[in-house]
Swiss-Prot record:
A biological process from GO: tricarboxylic acid cycle
Record's catalysed reaction(s): succinate + ATP + CoA = succinyl-CoA + ADP + phosphate; GTP + succinate + CoA = succinyl-CoA + GDP + phosphate
Quaternary context: Heterotetramer of two alpha and two beta subunits.
Designated name of the protein: Succinate--CoA ligase [ADP-forming] subunit beta
EC number: 6.2.1.5
Organism of origin: Geobacillus sp. (strain WCH70)
Amino acid sequence: MNIHEYQAKEILRNYGVSVPNGRVAFTVEEAVEAAKELGSPVCVVKAQIHAGGRGKAGGVKVAKSLDEVRTYASELLGKVLVTHQTGPEGKEVKRLLIEEGCDIKKEYYIGLVVDRATSRVVLMGSEEGGTEIEEVAAKTPEKIFKEYIDPAVGLQAFQARRLAFNINIPKELVNQAVKFMMGLYQVFVDKDCSIAEINPLVVTGDGKVMALDAKLNFDSNALYRHKDILEYRDLDEEDPKEVEASKYDLNYIALDGNIGCMVNGAGLAMATMDIIKYYGGEPANFLDVGGGATAEKVTEAFKIILSDPNVKGIFVNIFGGIMKCDVIASGIVEATKQVGLNLPLVVRLEGTNVELGKKILQESGLNITAADSMADGAQKIVELVR
């Protein structure tokens, strides 16, 4: 789950991590009032959307008067911001962060992620702050330094200190930087983050180390124990189909193709998308109905798939282990009748009660194409949507 920059900074502030003073604003008047409260001669007006690259897209403005705050807030609120992370459709700006300006002396990068190769959290740092870290990794990987963290003892002060020296934090500010990194790590662990990224981390003219921007993403599987984090969820920033799917414990991710997929199990879902591509088709979604799908879940899955106007056909690929094929078949028949499906539908069933499942489909009287294998099903749906 993603949250906004101002929300991330609120969490960091609670952990003693240094961030600039700021206020969130939903209207132009609120933006002006926030700037008045801050009382800073320079304010930064920042568009709040769930995407990076806002500065390059014109979503970050420096205001030197209340009139400029009003002008920039008027420009940004309601604007559709297109960045390299939003896609061409962009995201509408519905809230702003009004933040006090600061005298930036030097920019750095600090980030925490889970490293799959070592199964450990890794603290990364670079003195190439303010730019895309992927770009730095590709062009000058030697400028990125890493500290792998032992989960039994957590981040140690000597590791944070070593990283601070490696990225050339001024010696007199190393202790501040160490405190910053230790606090950031505590947030990462306590809140079950998947990413904690500060880009840029800045050293200011008056000798402070602080987060000028902050990105926190959270492991969705751990949200049940973080009610406080769930309150930060902004449904306006999420795909409505994905939001609807989450209500029924369906794992749905929208894609750009025209073949809707309904599969049980993430691995099989990935393989299904691959084989559709192999035979010349384009999947419209990733949809994992899980191991305990009911007829109701299958019906809702169909509705979500069909809410995408690009879908021209559906491929259902089910391996019945825990889930029985006859239950899925009944769900497919019920869903097809409920939604009035008039698109090509190819179904491949295998596993527990497969013969009973096939019989239910055959006797339904509906226009359902049966497939003998995953490859057969993929070829059939690709042909049918052409």
